[in-house]
């Protein structure tokens, strides 16, 4: 009887636990209920990996390994069975008295560590766990980025490796300042071996866990390699003297700490019994070593990643970490999450087509129960301006249908591609945001105030001291600063300590007064930190240093940016106050400086702002948008020119394309351009091989009206001078005719699907007149001329008769689409004019400024507030004048 009750209760317990995770699919539940030993979760794009991570943590805390177990902590009673049945049937919580019976080896929330790459990704699980487990349990889970986790460890144990617990974290600018000092000391010519190259080499060494001593011992390949090793050692010496770590040090030094101090290592292994790592495919050698050192003897490590989305090789990531996980951790259970909840099936099929051409992968195929959706729209532009106009047209159509600007993202391979889009959007008055532009904390005035705050937190921070000692101007020149640095080095003390006794040094006699005044400022700031709140301290820094007075004086003189810089300092104080509100009693100056040092570009992205988002594909990792524009799909651009010489690099480019494609939820627009200017040079590139890898059934192709006109008239394209086989060259094929009979008796295709090795295939593929074939604008498989809207070469897939998107110029907020027809002459507006915008509605002109034959018009719209736009581009109608 007892045995049967035990079995019945355990079966009911499984059912009860499964109902708690009823929204998960079968594979997700399997990942959640696999609790012990190494676990590899291969999570495809949009497969709900964050949901799995959160639910797995919740299961570890609420139920432990109870699911699937036949063990109970005490003998089961009939009442236990009855109460559990009732809870299952009614969908209510089981009685509190059964809590112990529903758990097995459950852990406390503070025994779990979850590590990922971005603050956003680290914050989301904590928020969801608060909702699932309650505030206290959710808050106790340590969810953090790699770097934040390392800072937390170092704050406690830094003295064990010779650093102060109040260490400073240097950013890129700080590192360059240190390196400049090293170059000066070692008499190294920056032109022979650029500082940036030295810093990059140092970063690679730290990612590979190569110490300065090892770098010096290893025979250098050339003179530059020997120089790099010397500056690495000198650079690290300066950082140690300053009590500072650079960004790469945070992981590198934590690994050294854990590897060399068994007591510290065991402390964390015992504290965090379960370790979960997200985005494992992007980990470096140093990050892998860190994870290994944190993993306890039970090997309760779960890594979540997607080898198909490993895109950070240039930052030191190694895909081998995820590919070799099962070998490194014997007994690993591998679970694949392949059901996608984000995208339409057409978008997923396009992504699968591309990624299956890679060989270095575990292998999986995404699928979805979502609708088939629209086909992927492929647009061939005449140039980058045409590409920008096409994007604006499509967005305008979506807005007409009730869409929002924030639903749209323009993604590109490299930052330089954003310039034409940004320029066009700005002229057209299209609200947009570039993610990855200058960050707030990188503005000069903000960095200056943060530097003041930093030297108060860490008196050894000579780099930040150098930055602000004469900012605002105090008659403390570079010569004086160099003397201070020499005196400090001779005595083994900080520069600030020398300044505090400036009157004791004859070499500083000419600068005694300004130096002692600076020391008085420093003492006032120290007192402020001890007696006032952190945001009040920030305000004091701005005022006591004279920085506010300097900017106010600049504003009075009419300096254009002074008012903006003052506003930025006001925002800085607000940011400090927000930090204090979030951290309560735990708020500290060191903590605030730590937070700003660890902010990434994507952390500043505001999803609630109604703007079109422009960003690199790398920045878009982990994000999703209803409408995605993937631009510049051309050979030499995407994939990049350099990647074509390395199979490993080419596979990384293909993974990057896969990431870009899978950001789209509803519709995906891919564009390539016949002609593109990059870095001041116009280049003509073939369409990307990644386009040709997509099966034709998943796409629709349209082309620029200019290319259509050229095609219909039998003219060659702007490619003609690069094409072997004739002057006319490409004459406007428009379909994805992969199965058509084409040049030289080979199977051809559309313009986008032409082959590379023309000499080997008897023709240059589709789109070009190949060797031995006519270049007059006719298919070798037909005697009829090609015309606009024809089916491409031979009998291939034709372009749609009526393209889905941008079939005609559309009215967008400031869209220049209306300017494509013949101009009706320049528009003229005056202050007080009442105007009607086709999307923004009615508004009043507040200001007008002449600009190169046009006007910049500032309008207060009744619906959307104040906007600026170019008069000749905006779809405005003057209603009346006041």
Segments from the language model and where they lie:
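Conserved helicase/translocase P-loop NTPase motor core
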Residues: 23, 70, 80, 87-96, ...
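Conserved helicase C-terminal RecA-like lobe
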Residues: 217-221, 404, 418-430, 443, ...
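C-terminal accessory regions
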Residues: 633-865, 873-882
